A protein has these predicted regions:
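Ligand-binding pocket segment of bilobal, Venus flytrap-like solute-binding proteins
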Residues: 203-288
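Ligand-binding clefts/hinges and TM-proximal coupling segments of bilobed small-molecule sensing domains
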Residues: 161-189, 323-350
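Short helix-loop capping/hinge motifs at secondary-structure junctions, enriched
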Residues: 148-155, 197, 211-219, 306-315
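Extracytoplasmic/secreted envelope proteins and their assembly/folding machinery
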Residues: 59-66, 86-89, 107-110, 114, ...
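Sec/Tat-exported extracytoplasmic proteins
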Residues: 69, 73-76, 96, 103-106, ...
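Extracellular/periplasmic juxtamembrane helices and adjacent flexible linkers that interface
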Residues: 1-31, 305-394
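Periplasmic-binding protein-like
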Residues: 129-143, 229-244, 279-308, 313
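N-terminal segment of the mature folded domain
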Residues: 2, 26-186, 194-197, 383, ...
Length: 394
């Protein structure tokens, strides 16, 4: 009996010795310890959690990129949360969500949050250097329209679809016949998203305002002008519903044809994904570019909130670097995005690249000059003005 007890004691001592040596050499991380503390991607017994909140327009691209990232970074627990840009900005401000990194659809949403965050907390939410906001992919705002309707509007706008031409069309009580269209087309039916909920709707409002004033430098006083407000209201009267999702417009245009929308304002990437599906159903659906380009630059940044640890920042940087790598940037092309990396050409030998084949549908490589984004204070007042003058269904 004593012999058996001695064997058990010796076994326990041996195991304890092995564990002690392993810990001394850093080869074993026990539950509850911080791990090796090395760079993201190093072997570790525990994972660093990175919560990445992103605009849903790039869901397919982000999810595909996450698969390859996870295979290389086993020590990073990457959590993806797709959410509308303006909704996410408000929830971050209110503390309802606390992401490690954020990538809205456009810098407008980021500028709005940065302004509101400074006002509320007196600190910066976004960093500088490697943590500063920088684009992942880019996509311009475009009109997508049925070709026969677009030709009438372009004639009215001197060869282009402009907001002034659209204002005239939407204000006509006699509908399409008043501007040279067919009586069976009825009233002009235009669509864009709710500016208070969706980035593309906010961009639409910015674009209208730039076109009205003929300049991109705005003041709060410009937004208080009654004539300007009446002009905006006349355009919005022709929007039958303010959807929360830009993708809804493309789906509905293909599904219901011009009975639902004659034209809509969407991201180029979304239009590209549906153009070929639409052909032959209701006529030709094509892209038309705004006279001044507004980019959705899909900026991403590691947040400087108190809830983000140094290990999480390291892991988040590795994730964003992965998204900006050449391989992942080239994958974005197949989904209709323009790579943020200027070294990645829009045209290549990939047969699945839409930029190689969709020129006949209006897709262009070279675009009109780009307009700058307004600052956060202008954006906040623009949204306040819109909610005051535009009636919406509950």
């Amino acid at each position: 009996m004593r012999g058996k007890l001695l064997i058990v004691v010796l076994f326990v001592v041996a195991v304890a010795g092995v564990v002690w040596l392993a810990q001394r050499r850093g080869a074993l991380t026990l539950p509850g310890t911080s791990g090796s503390g090395g760079a993201p991607g190093a072997s570790s017994g525990s994972q660093v959690t990175v919560t990445f909140v992103y605009g849903t327009e790039k869901r397919d691209w982000v999810e595909a990129a996450a698969e390859s990232f996870r295979s290389k970074h086993r020590d990073v627990d990457l959590k993806l949360v797709g959410q509308g840009s303006l909704e996410a900005a408000q929830q971050i401000l209110e503390g309802k969500i606390q992401p490690t990194a954020w990538a809205p659809a456009d810098s407008l949403a980021m500028s709005l949050l940065e302004s509101d965050w400074r006002t509320k907390n007196g600190t910066a939410l976004f960093g500088t250097g490697e943590d500063a906001p920088a684009p992942l992919v880019i996509s311009p705002l475009v009109f997508v329209a049925w070709e026969d309707r677009a030709e009438v509007l372009a004639k009215l706008g001197g060869g282009h679809i402009t907001w002034k031409a659209l204002h005239q069309a939407l204000s006509a009580d006699q509908g399409w016949p008043a501007i040279g269209g067919k009586a069976e087309w009825g009233f002009v039916k235009f669509g864009h998203t709710d500016p208070t909920r969706s980035n593309s709707g906010l961009q639409a409002l910015v674009s209208m305002t730039y076109d009205y004033y003929g300049r991109t430098q705005l003041t709060v006083g410009d937004l208080l002008d009654p004539k300007y407000q009446a002009w905006i209201k006349a355009i919005e009267k022709g929007v039958t519903r303010f959807e929360a999702s830009t993708g809804t417009f493309m789906t509905d245009m293909v599904r219901f044809g011009p009975s639902r929308y004659d034209l809509a304002l969407v991201y180029e990437s979304l239009a590209v994904s549906q153009l070929e599906n639409a052909q032959g159903r209701w006529g030709n659906l094509k892209l038309y570019y705004l006279p001044t380009t507004l980019w959705s630059d899909h900026p991403a940044a590691v947040l400087q909130g108190s809830w983000v640890t140094s290990d999480q920042k390291k892991a988040a940087r590795a994730w964003l670097q992965h998204l900006r790598s050449r391989e992942i940037q080239e994958q974005a092309l197949r989904l209709g995005f323009r790579p943020a990396d200027p070294a990645v050409p829009l045209k290549n030998q990939d047969p699945s690249n839409p930029f190689n084949r969709l020129g006949p549908y209006g897709l262009q490589l070279d675009l009109p000059p780009a307009a700058p984004s307004p600052d956060g204070a202008i954006v906040r007042n623009l949204l306040s003005m819109w909610t005051r003058i535009v009636p919406r269904s509950p």
